[in-house]
Amino acid sequence: AVMAALLCAPKALGTTIGEFSIEQIYVNVPELDVFVQATDAQGQPISPDLVRAAGVELYLGDEKIPTGNIGMANEPICYVLAVDNSVDETTLKEYRIALRRLISAKGAKDQIMLYTLAGDAACVLPATIDTRAAVNAVNALESQEENEPNLVQAATIIYNDINENYQSIAPRKVIFALSEAGNTATSTALLGAVAKDAASRLNMPLDIFVTVDD
């Protein structure tokens, strides 16, 4: 099933509804089956039955999504990490730290894919659940300040890789793109180019992370 974040759902989820909160919402396209991650006051997952009973209303654009088919979102996730390594070594070091933290927090069946964007975009780690392999790939990232990213090419490569290997990649997929805040053109192009291909055509959530100088 193709999983997509509901566009109507707030980015910073966790809005309290009764005695539980909605942490994350996905919708299966085109069937429009709804999946949620909801927790109680102690942060423990709760049954979808409670979400349905609370009368939660969901909308995709102007269309109301029926909530009678709500289910628990507990399938593995593939984290597609797109790193703009055309930054300096100091910034890339910050990226490595953040990526290692993400990898260490992933579920046992969650996958990591890693792309570098400097110059010609390349997949340096195909989808894997191997935490050690993912950390080693992150540690091996090198700064290539002289090579500007080709973001249109990068978006196409990411889309094609996911599309061609769709069945072997985890059911839920999300792209994390890391870029520098100072490079506005890069950040904007990443959001536009990647969203156009991988995010919209594959119905994948997209997050852009940028670094900011103190």
Predicted feature descriptions by range:
Residues Y79-A82, I112-T116, V174-A177, P205-V210:
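Structural recognition of the beta-strand scaffold that forms the well-ordered cores
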Residues I17-G18, I22-V80, S86-K93:
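Acidic, polar low-complexity linker/tail segments
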Residues V36-Q37, P76-N85, L117, A134-E142, ...:
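Acidic/histidine-rich, surface-exposed loop or edge segments in extracytoplasmic proteins
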Residues A12-G14:
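Boundary at the C-terminal end of the N-terminal hydrophobic targeting segment
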Residues I70-Y79, S86-T116, P126-A133, N150:
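…and closely analogous acidic/polar surface helices at protein-protein or active-site interfaces
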Residues I97, G119-D207:
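Exposed acidic/Ser/Thr-rich ligand/metal-binding surfaces
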Residues P45-P48, G71-M72, L102-K106, N160-I169, ...:
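Surface-exposed acidic, glycine-flexible loop patches that form ligand/cofactor-binding
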